[in-house]
């Protein structure tokens, strides 16, 4: 199946065990909803329902997140898939916190110029489309690691709902029709497998409300259900991925898959107005950027400004500009960048310096080419 490059938010799952158990089934809009015992939030109501059922059956937050993630592999083909990667931040009822990094990794055969032609120009959008654009997937390994360390229910039980969703099918939606129309327009051979999977008879879009089944995905998920991480990184699935790559000019090998490892990392921890903030560390920029922004915002009386007032939005924009400038300048993969000044970036003293550079009567520039030199 053709895969496209997955960016920062491959999938987002929120499992909150603080707030009767319910699932909001509306697909559109943002509607605040309370719950007293538990809440599962995802991009698709069927995935959220699957995760909520895990909680009702006595599973914990990590169990629910795993089930929700695999269900999204079925219901959210544009992002929530097993062919990408992601991050997980965990904070337990006992106060312990940890994070898991399972982002995609470059194959061993990757090189600096693999996307460029003889003139140094990107070839055929190959950095965004096609087999060269993807890294070695990490989702299955990451969820497997999180389950081994923090899960409570049997792995097979947690993956089962996604297998059933793929086998039995679920109603297509207008959103899905819009997303999958992309494949209908593609004529290159590399898209043949995707068209078979995502289009009716390989040619037509499923109409909203029509049942969509994914037997090949169900088979892949079944191997993961029964064999754990080896059901993806070794054996039949790995062989199928390697064969596809070879056929279409990709470079991911069975060895790349077998060698993939997720990692558990110490979280970014800070404090905002008395609240502990726990975030994802690099290679994610999220934890550092959020903490940097909050530290700057702490210097302002936001309540007095009023929500979405001109003054409030100005401060918020300026704070974000500074955090994203530092994000571009400093944050990378710690496996290749050992000297990131993380403690400085999330310190209160540094936030004081940045906040002092904000002028209330003047907007600063948003120039990515000059990031890192604009403010201090």
Which role fits each region the language model picked out?
Residues 1-12:
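Bacterial N-terminal signal peptides that target proteins for export
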Residues 136, 286, 290, 312-313:
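Short, charged, low-complexity patches
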Residues 299-376:
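Internal maturation/activation junctions in enzymes
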Residues 10-22:
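Bacterial N-terminal signal peptides
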Residues 27-49, 53, 61-62, 66-234, ...:
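Noncatalytic scaffold domains of N-terminal-nucleophile
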